[in-house]
Amino acid sequence: MELAKSFEPAAIEARWYPEWESRGHFDAGLDKSNPNAFCILLPPPNVTGTLHMGHGFNQTIMDALTRYHRMRGFNTLWQPGTDHAGIATQIVVERQLDAKGVSRHDLGREKFVEKVWEWKEYSGGTITRQMRRLGTSPDWKRERFTMDEGLSKTVTETFVRLYNEGLIYRGKRLVNWDPKLGTAVSDLEVVSEEEDGFLWHITYPFSDGPVGDLKGLTVATTRPETMLGDVAVMVHPEDERYAHLIGKTVRLPLCERDIPIIGDDYVDREFGTGCVKVTPAHDFNDYAVGLRHNLPMISILRLDAHVSDDAPEKYRGMDRFVAREVIVQDLEAQGLLAGIKPHKLMVPRGDRTSAVIEPMLTDQWFVAMTKPGADGRSITAKALECVASGEIRFYPENWINTYNQWLNNIQDWCISRQLWWGHQIPAWYADVEGDSRVWVAHDEAEAKSLAAKDGFTGRLRRDDDVLDTWYSSALWPFSTLDWTAEWPEKSNDALDLYLPSSVLVTGFDIIFFWVARMVMMTKHITGKIPFRDVYVHGLIRDAEGQKMSKSKGNVLDPIDLIDGISADELAKKRTFGLMNPKQAQSIEKKTRKEFPEGIPAFGTDALRFTFASLATPGRDIKFDLSRCEGYRNFCNKLWNATRFVLMNCEGQDCGISAAAGSAACNTANLDFSFADRWIVSKLQRTEAEVAQHFRDYRFDLVSKAVYEFVWDEYCDWYVELAKVQIQSGTEAQQRATRRTLLRVLETVLRLAHPLIPFITEELWQTVAPLAGRKDTDSIMLARYPEADLSRLDEASEAKIAELKAIVGTCRNLRSEMNISPAQRMPLVAAGEATILTSYAPYLAGLARLSEVAVVDEIGTDELAPVAVAGRFKLMLRVEIDIAAERERIAKEIARLEGEMTKAESKLANESFVARAPATVVQQERERLASFVATLEKLRPQLEKLGAR
């Protein structure tokens, strides 16, 4: 197979992905005789969604892990699937209907759900098609959807079990309510941002007249409309201004109700007036106060956020914000408005509707998070124990604190949503006015049977609500493995092999909403942990650290980075759908300034390498497009290095049939140079590093190790050294070098494959047969490299380090003397003759030398600059500008003296010597010795020039 002259990623990607998939290379391993199993769960994206940068990053990490373990011979499963995404999907379909002037209520539940299924079938494949563009290798044959029949049965089964155990209940509680959607929403679906508002100061008169100089208590509130539902005013029990008033009552303005003054240390004495109105039905903090003090709860808003009939007649039916204006006017008219001050406050809004979220007291279904189960432990306690015992490990470890903190302060989980798209709650009610009995069952027939046992044989009505999307997501670790109610008596190979899975890769933003709930539900239902490790990564942001969002106009599409996009198309994409013309204009201008030529096509491998390199521990990941360019250059470098190897090895005797290992070094067939042994030794170190970094989930360090070996060691040094050996070596040396070129390159391709699958597959297909390692049809199934530490060669490594230092010194001399790179110069070198003679051919090639003259000593009368490289003195024969050379050496002496002073200071510091690692202290001593030795050689040189 002939290799193309240049790397064209699009053609390679289009060819190889269908090949991998059609050959079954992504299929789950189900060999139960193999004790090694690796499983990873794809956090299910919204079924009708599209791929964003967070997906691209997350999936690159998961695919790298999957390919790595697959190549190590593990049974491997990357479990893919999508989420029905209740709210998000329902909103999309409702908007489509709105455009036609139809509401979901016009259609009715059954027909509306049919429409959603139609939309799911139409757009549901978009994100999985995009995942394929990223080169991901999940077992697509096992793809799951949270509303598949099997997963839906699991949802019902777990709900019924938890209800029968008393761990699911229905009750009236305060929840986040989105009045535009008409449903409860989770904390994750609420975005709080600082906005400009006001702090209204309202006086509540004492019921029995003034107390001393006080006519009443003045409260400060940002929401005066909720005062209609006030049931108390609270003060801090130790506040000297008000403590004596606790137990008295005030008259609630506009409502003519008397409410008590209570003491509670929740009150911040320094904020506002130190008096706080208490509205338990419309504020989460007040709700907790209400429970502590056994206060009544008065809902003064309907579910559509209009004032309810529990409020004074004048305000009934008003929108909450209209009511606010009228109430403020009425308070002012009665002389009870003590003041208004501008105030910045956090306003909670629905992330999809932007409607202000209303804390609302409604009937909902809940999971009891802290109630002991049959075994005496709550599901939360079990989840805490899993991590405390080390059964589940977090990487980085600091996320354990976040996990524990949330679980230790957990509230019961509201799992019902007032939607039509989702898993309908399996609960049936007696369809009789005044009968509140409910029967939870697997189906209606079972519900009727349960009702009959309770003496009810009338008509049943199913609960209209559906379950929170996170409920079915919490079951993902076992529902996707075809768990059934008969488990463990009836199981299957996948469930036996892959529960628990090996690692969960997730962003820190869903530790509470998904990670903790998977631990709770999986442990409680199956008795097993869902996964052993949790790798928590940061969130992808733009180069300035800003969150990527449509409104900011800084969103990047991974597919655009792979394929490229013109400036016109990018501007059009970023401004599409924006309602504000000024905002659209600003975003277009910014986009054209940032990307005047658009975005070039980087290809999948360059993008994946970029994502891996950015996977550092931390909360934020700044995505810099220039990194993509750098890694595209890396791919080109690897491609060109392979072309060089093929040009020099195809049709040549590469010694591949010769015996491998140390014995080959002593045969006439193969004569390995110190350069050959060095690159093999460095490869072992790199393989060991990469393995350790994979174990530690340090993908940034995996990419760094691969990059530095390929670019810095193999391409920049070994290939150049190999050119010398191929041109001037004996047949046995040439054969050994060709063998090394091939074997190391083939190994490197396998080493890099998990990160950059397409280019490595394409190159491997050509290189592997020449390297004698083509024992499978794809690099995906080739064995992953493992370090052989017996092949470390410290002597060869030391020689190359010395050679690099000499070459570097020669290059510095050329640069300082402004010698053209094209001009070959003679070098005079003083030092150990046998060593310098062995280096000479390499020096001539790498430092552009016409000859290397080895001498015992460089004469003191020489005026050409003399540089020191370790134990050698080097001089290029060239006409010298004495003054300039004197200045150069003087500067170098001054620099070295400064470095020597720093090193001496460090070593004189007892704290440094005592506390620093011994290796660090030794390094500092060696640096000092090096400075001293170099200065001893440079000072005479300066004296010599000064004497002229």
Swiss-Prot record:
Q: Which GO terms describe its biological process?
A: valyl-tRNA aminoacylation
Q: Which organism is it from?
A: Aromatoleum aromaticum (strain DSM 19018 / LMG 30748 / EbN1) (Azoarcus sp. (strain EbN1))
Instruction: List the taxonomic lineage.
Output: Bacteria, Pseudomonadati, Pseudomonadota, Betaproteobacteria, Rhodocyclales
Query: InterPro entries from the entry?
Result: aa-tRNA-synth_I_CS (IPR001412), aa-tRNA-synth_Ia (IPR002300), Anticodon_Ia_Val (IPR033705), M/V/L/I-tRNA-synth_anticd-bd (IPR013155), Rossmann-like_a/b/a_fold (IPR014729), tRNA-bd_arm (IPR010978), tRNAsynth_Ia_anticodon-bd (IPR009080), Val-tRNA_synth_C_sf (IPR037118)
Which gene name belongs to this protein?
valS
**Which top class of enzyme applies to this chain?**
ligase
**CDD domains reported in the protein's UniProt record:** Anticodon_Ia_Val, ValRS_core
Output this protein's name.
Valine--tRNA ligase
Assembly behavior: Monomer.
Q: Where are the annotated coiled coils located?
A: 877-912
Q: Where is this motif: 'HIGH' region?
A: 45-55
